[in-house]
């Protein structure tokens, strides 16, 4: 083997491996600026000259994006999905809704304003422009128009409080996203635990967020996860409205699944092949 051939094989091997990278950006919360980071999964054979689908996946209470990425074993899952062409050439971003570590606390009800702020402001104004300027997605420009035109190639999902965030993203940013993966968490748009205690009002509020644009909600929960007590009545109430049906709103119960990042990884894998379908 020639030296040139050996070098070429080394380069090919490096290119064929996925990467875990970090992106830095700034955001403002309650008139104070914060420096933040998000973990980014970059697929094998990433080519900055080609367009890539993109998913934003949010963690649960007290976690960070990096924690969720590692605890859910997402690198292994995403490598496998990419290898078998089930979710090929897709960038996956793992952000956090906490402005910094001082906001982390064991009372997850206190996270609600942070979930809402992230969905309504930080996601589209700060995170998405930073990420999609660095990586080549379907957005021709990293402004509102560019994000609108590329919405069919963008998804948002999350676990637990990240699922609460996902419902807020659906409610406020349908124009920028087509696919949604709320896992192990209901919508708190009316009130905390609203899927259980205000299921009809919650469903109606979410229905009001829809328009002529198509969308896909891929909801999931573990069979042994107590959050099913909030998710199930909400999903059933949504199905009773004309805006939702069993095609644009699916609900998967994972056999033996628990309220854990590990179960969420499996729920994500279950739905991966249904993302970004035209």
Regions found by a protein language model. Name each.
Residues 1-5:
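Bacterial N-terminal signal peptides
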């Amino acid at each position: 083997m020639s030296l040139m051939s050996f070098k070429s094989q080394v380069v090919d091997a490096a290119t064929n491996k996925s990467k875990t990278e970090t992106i830095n950006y700034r955001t403002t919360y309650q008139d104070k600026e914060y420096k933040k980071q998000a973990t980014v999964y970059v697929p094998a054979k990433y080519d900055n000259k080609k367009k890539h689908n993109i998913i934003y996946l949010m963690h649960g209470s007290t976690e960070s994006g990096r924690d969720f990425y590692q605890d859910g074993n997402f690198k292994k899952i995403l490598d496998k999905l990419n290898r078998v062409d089930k979710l090929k050439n897709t960038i996956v971003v793992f952000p956090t809704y906490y402005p910094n570590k001082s906001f982390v606390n064991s009372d997850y009800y206190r996270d609600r304003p942070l979930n809402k702020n992230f969905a309504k402001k930080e996601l589209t104004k700060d995170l998405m422009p930073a990420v999609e300027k660095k990586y080549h997605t379907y957005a021709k420009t990293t402004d509102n128009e560019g994000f609108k035109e590329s919405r069919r190639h963008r998804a948002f999902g999350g676990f637990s409080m990240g699922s609460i965030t996902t419902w807020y993203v659906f409610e406020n940013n349908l124009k920028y996203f087509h696919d949604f993966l709320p896992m192990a968490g209901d919508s708190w748009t009316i009130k905390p635990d609203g899927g259980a205690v205000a299921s009809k009002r919650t469903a109606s509020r979410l229905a009001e967020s829809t328009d002529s644009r198509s969308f896909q909600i891929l909801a999931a929960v573990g069979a042994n996860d107590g959050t099913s007590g909030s998710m199930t009545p909400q999903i059933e109430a949504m199905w009773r409205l004309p805006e939702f049906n069993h095609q644009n709103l699916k609900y998967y119960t994972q056999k033996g699944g628990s309220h854990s990042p590990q179960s969420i990884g499996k729920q994500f894998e279950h739905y991966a092949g249904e993302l970004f379908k035209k």
